[in-house]
């Protein structure tokens, strides 16, 4: 962490550093502890990990949907990227996933876009707390691999979702392993709750990444964040919103 723009660099700049953890929380800590700003990140994941974020793609900016709600804006593995964006750690972000993946297969509380009908009330209410963000969402079919200078943030369920067969998992592993690229750094989260139960596949993938980048993985300890509790008023609001969002999603309305 020798430079605030480069949180996972070491004494040999040409060498790719590989971090491995059970969840994505330790990556947020790396960025925070390193004083990182304006990073470019390629995030390969079945889920967005941006719960609570509203992205205005047309104007290149983002803000929290719930501007000051401590419960909805809590940090965890489902929102760490939202906080990384809002704190200025990340200003260029690409979210890459399989065709079976992304918002259509995520839970109700995933990232919102400016074109979403469900985002309209929050846009009407306004808000001055926008931060700059260049954002693109892509499937593997349109992805050409990490770009020079990008950090690769990879959630194992982006390659090995729990419903996938091993053949499909190996096809997606090749999207990473068979490409020629040298990322600024690599972070892999296991995300056992959502990934394929065969641990040997994950371990094999890490071993092959070590070989690909001629490095040894740095295993980071687990990290948990205080979750807090929702207020009574938020619980009442949530009951109504959950019902409305679920009905909209069934009709493919965002």
Please describe what each predicted stretch is:
Residues 38-59:
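Short, solvent-exposed beta-strand-terminating loops
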Residues 64:
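Acidic/polar active-site rim loop that often engages polyanionic ligands
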Residues 1-41, 60, 68-254:
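Catalytic cores of soluble, metal-dependent hydrolases
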């Amino acid at each position: 962490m020798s430079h605030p723009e480069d949180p996972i660099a070491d004494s040999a700049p040409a060498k790719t550093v590989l971090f491995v953890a059970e969840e994505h929380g330790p990556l947020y800590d790396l960025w925070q502890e390193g004083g990182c700003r304006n990073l470019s990140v390629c995030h390969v994941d079945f889920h967005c990990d941006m719960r609570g974020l509203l992205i205005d793609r047309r104007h290149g900016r983002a803000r929290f949907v719930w501007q000051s709600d401590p419960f909805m804006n809590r940090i965890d593995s489902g929102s760490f990227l939202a906080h990384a964006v809002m704190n200025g750690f990340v200003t260029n972000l690409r979210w890459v996933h399989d065709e079976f993946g992304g918002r259509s297969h995520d839970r109700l509380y995933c990232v919102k876009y400016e074109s979403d009908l469900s985002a309209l009330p929050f846009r009407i209410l306004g808000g001055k707390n926008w931060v700059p963000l260049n954002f693109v969402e892509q499937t593997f079919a349109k992805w050409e691999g990490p770009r020079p200078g990008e950090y690769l943030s990879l959630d194992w369920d982006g390659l090995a979702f729990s419903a996938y067969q091993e053949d499909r998992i190996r096809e997606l592993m090749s999207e990473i392993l068979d490409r020629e690229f040298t990322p600024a750094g690599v972070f892999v989260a296991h995300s056992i709750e959502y990934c394929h139960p065969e641990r040997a596949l994950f371990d094999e993938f890490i071993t092959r990444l070590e070989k690909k980048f001629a490095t040894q993985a740095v295993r980071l300890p687990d990290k948990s964040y205080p979750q807090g509790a929702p207020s009574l008023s938020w619980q009442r609001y949530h009951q109504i919103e959950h019902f409305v969002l679920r009905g909209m999603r069934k009709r493919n309305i965002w």
